[in-house]
Amino acid sequence: MVHWTDFERSTIKDIFAKIDYDCVGPAAFARCLIVYPWTQRYFGNFGNLFNAAAIIGNPNVAKHGITIMHGLERGVKNLDHLTETYEELSVLHSEKLHVDPDNFKLISDCLTIVVASRLGKAFTGEVQAALQKFLAVVVFSLGKQYH
């Protein structure tokens, strides 16, 4: 079980309360597909992913980015039970979708960049540490089925 300080708990909740899922999710997911093009192989049914402009303008990318944000929101609401919270998604991604678990880290890195750009000066080192700790535990939890 992960130990969360009061600061970490409040910071994680505050970040997710401040950001617009409809902007941050699509931006983070699009960034992941652009920066790490090999991740596109899981999304062949999304249509045109041939260049950055196509990815950014793709409604399927936007929709999945929002889905990712709502998935993370589940974790924010269940900080003390993240492994259990993501158990079903871990099974889905490993056994049905066969997603490389390293991709969870890639999207979390892209999300950190997008959140930092949205929060600006409020994204201090301490805030980043809390967010990245949360995302690291989510990544671990999503990859649990692979172990």
Curated annotation (Swiss-Prot):
Per the UniProt record, the source organism is: Liparis tunicatus (Kelp snailfish)
Lineage per the UniProt record: Eukaryota, Metazoa, Chordata, Craniata, Vertebrata
According to the record's subunit comment, the protein's assembly and interactions are: Hb1 is a heterotetramer of two alpha-1 chains and two beta-1 chains.
Question: What keywords are annotated for this sequence in UniProt?
Answer: Heme, Iron, Metal-binding, Oxygen transport, Transport
An example GO CC term for this entry is: hemoglobin complex
PROSITE patterns under this entry? GLOBIN
* Organism superkingdom: Eukaryota
Q: What's a single GO BP term from this record?
A: hydrogen peroxide catabolic process
Where does tissue-level expression of this protein occur? Red blood cells.
Query: What family is reported?
Result: Belongs to the globin family.
Q: What gene name does this entry carry?
A: hbb1
This chain's protein is named Hemoglobin subunit beta-1
Q: Which GO terms describe its molecular function?
A: haptoglobin binding; heme binding; metal ion binding; organic acid binding; oxygen binding; oxygen carrier activity; peroxidase activity
The UniProt function text for this chain reads: Involved in oxygen transport from gills to the various peripheral tissues.
Record: residues binding heme b: 64, 93
The record's annotation in InterPro entries points to:
Globin, Globin-like_sf, Globin/Proto, Hemoglobin_b, Hemoglobin_oxygen_transport
General remark? This fish has two hemoglobins: Hb1 (major) and Hb2. Hb1 has low oxygen affinity, it displays a pronounced Bohr effect, which is enhanced by ATP, and a pronounced Root effect.
Q: Which residues form the Globin domain?
A: 3-147
